[in-house]
Amino acid sequence: MSDQQNTQQEDQPFFNIQRVYLKDMSLEQPNSPGIFLESEAPSVEVQVNVAASQLQEGIFEVVVTGTVTTKVQEKVAFLVEAHQAGIFDIRNVPVEQLDPLLGIACPTILYPYLRGNIADVITRAGFQAIHLSEINFQALYEQRLQAAMEEAQAAGGANSGIVMPDGSQARH
């Protein structure tokens, strides 16, 4: 191979999953064993959040956090919080594409692992499995962008400093 071919390959966008792992998980059953005697159907609340951080040049950790709180009447049956993480090698990606990659593609890869781990711990705790529904991380990402733009507008800046997925500056 010539030096020119090597340089061209080195400049190509590169995305690789280095590792997927369960970073943290907790289960609380504050009203057990009495809660198992309740006959009323439980209410379920689910919250999902995404965070990303750069570990070193081109290496990023993305964490998808899921919290499931189940109550019978006003008593908490259980609360599960899990942090499913992944380490991603991302190089030669244009800056305007990096944030959507970290906020959409990486969480989409991690979420099935999070769902499985949460369902497993709930079942092992003696409760009926709760299967979390799919999440459209693109819509979630766009909602966060919109909220950030509205916050910037409220602060009074003409240029929010937010870069849209197409690379343009967000303005109000």
UniProtKB/Swiss-Prot annotation:
Pfam families: SecB
Single biological process term from Gene Ontology: protein transport
Keywords for the protein's UniProt record, in alphabetical order: Chaperone, Cytoplasm, Protein transport, Translocation, Transport
Membrane-crossing segments per the record: none
GO MF, one example: unfolded protein binding
Cellular compartments annotated: Cytoplasm
Source domain of life: Bacteria
Cellular component, GO annotation: cytoplasm
Statement: the UniProt record of this protein carries the keyword Cytoplasm: yes
Coiled coil: none
Main location: cytoplasm
Keyword Chaperone among UniProt keywords: yes
UniProt xrefs under NCBIfam families: PRK05751.1-5, secB
Subunit structure: Homotetramer, a dimer of dimers. One homotetramer interacts with 1 SecA dimer.
Family label: Belongs to the SecB family.
Function statement: One of the proteins required for the normal export of preproteins out of the cell cytoplasm. It is a molecular chaperone that binds to a subset of precursor proteins, maintaining them in a translocation-competent state. It also specifically binds to its receptor SecA.
Protein name: Protein-export protein SecB
Natural source organism: Cupriavidus pinatubonensis (strain JMP 134 / LMG 1197)
Taxonomic path: Bacteria, Pseudomonadati, Pseudomonadota, Betaproteobacteria, Burkholderiales
Name of the encoding gene: secB
